[in-house]
Amino acid sequence: MKIVIAPDSYKESLSASEVAQAIEKGFREIFPDAQYVSVPVADGGEGTVEAMIAATQGAERHAWVTGPLGEKVNASWGISGDGKTAFIEMAAASGLELVPAEKRDPLVTTSRGTGELILQALESGATNIIIGIGGSATNDGGAGMVQALGAKLCDANGNEIGFGGGSLNTLNDIDISGLDPRLKDCVIRVACDVTNPLVGDNGASRIFGPQKGASEAMIVELDNNLSHYAEVIKKALHVDVKDVPGAGAAGGMGAALMAFLGAELKSGIEIVTTALNLEEHIHDCTLVITGEGRIDSQSIHGKVPIGVANVAKKYHKPVIGIAGSLTDDVGVVHQHGIDAVFSVLTSIGTLDEAFRGAYDNICRASRNIAATLAIGMRNAG
């Protein structure tokens, strides 16, 4: 009996690795001789680096890089056990959480630190880089990132433009001859579940600018600046990014990654499950167990449980979802490959109590799920 355990984290409570450990502990009480394969998963957002490190027997690295406001921040990233693949979260270097609420200003925040993390990955010898671009504080179109990698973004006087989305209107020319040559031999995949274009009513500035501190006037300025930026990119690089789905992700970072680095933007969960070789683990298993902090109707939109279930159903494997909580509309997940769902909560309490007791609750629920399966197996002969 081979059981694949592939959960996401329980946000603010347990990492994906800890959730997997708790599930395995509970199941082992009933099925001590089963083969357990633990594959912590993430959806390309928070926790992706940690999950990828755990699944590839990799290592966490740290680097001092330029933060969103130009200050130095100690950002973490990861490298796979074989040293070939680097894992980067934009939020670690250029994230909104790095900027106090009163200082959030997308006219000045820069993505330079993310470019510096990419340089760290190249220095390590990585030839594959997976980047999660959620949680950014920036609206600079990825300009800071490409400047860190050696591109020259110059104004009419030949001087490099400054930090932030507020400087893009001064851009006159782009020179990529100085881009780090190692990028040509590197495959960059971007975990991105946002399909917004770069500009317009559904663009980066209008949709995501407010959460980054943009006023209405700033949104208009930022959108105009990104439109100008796209025109200069089209003229210099012969790439039209203005209306490409995903170009508006992370304040236009999607556009820069595609135009300057030839990166591929794909669903976060799709990139992660492929990188983790999830199919290889699942194709000959008996049962798949997944989960996250809450399973509900939103889980069908790029979340880990459905991503795992999609892989499992290719091989007609049963899937059980274990969550901290379920909602009234959770039944929709049964149409997307999850056969049964269970909540680990046993009593009414505060959210803090649920967080504190999560590990033990998952163990208990997993043990009881396993016992129920064992009863069914015995009755089936």
Swiss-Prot record:
EC number annotated for this UniProt entry: 2.7.1.165
Signal peptide extent: none
Record field: pH dependence: Optimum pH is 7.3-7.9.
Nucleotide-binding recorded as keyword: yes
InterPro entries for this protein: Glyc_kinase_flavodox-like_fold, Glycerate_kinase, Glycerate_kinase_RE-like, Glycerate_kinase_sf
GO process annotations (BP): D-glucarate catabolic process; galactarate catabolic process; organic acid phosphorylation
UniProt KW keywords: ATP-binding, Kinase, Nucleotide-binding, Transferase
Catalytic reactions on record: (R)-glycerate + ATP = (2R)-2-phosphoglycerate + ADP + H(+)
Keyword Mitochondrion appears in the UniProt entry: no
One Pfam match: Gly_kinase
UniProt GO molecular function: ATP binding; glycerate 2-kinase activity; glycerate kinase activity
Induction of synthesis: In glycerate, glucarate and glycolate-grown cells but not in glucose-grown cells (at protein level).
PANTHER family (alphabetical): GLYCERATE 2-KINASE (PTHR21599:SF7), GLYCERATE KINASE (PTHR21599)
Note from the entry: GK1 has a half-life of 92 minutes while GK2 has a half-life of 11 minutes at 49 degrees Celsius.
Family: Belongs to the glycerate kinase type-1 family.
Purpose: Catalyzes the transfer of the phosphate group from adenosine triphosphate (ATP) to (R)-glycerate to form (2R)-2-phosphoglycerate, an enzymatic step in (L)-glucarate/galactarate catabolic pathway.
Designated name of the protein: Glycerate 2-kinase
Protein's organism: Escherichia coli (strain K12)
Gene that this polypeptide is encoded by: garK
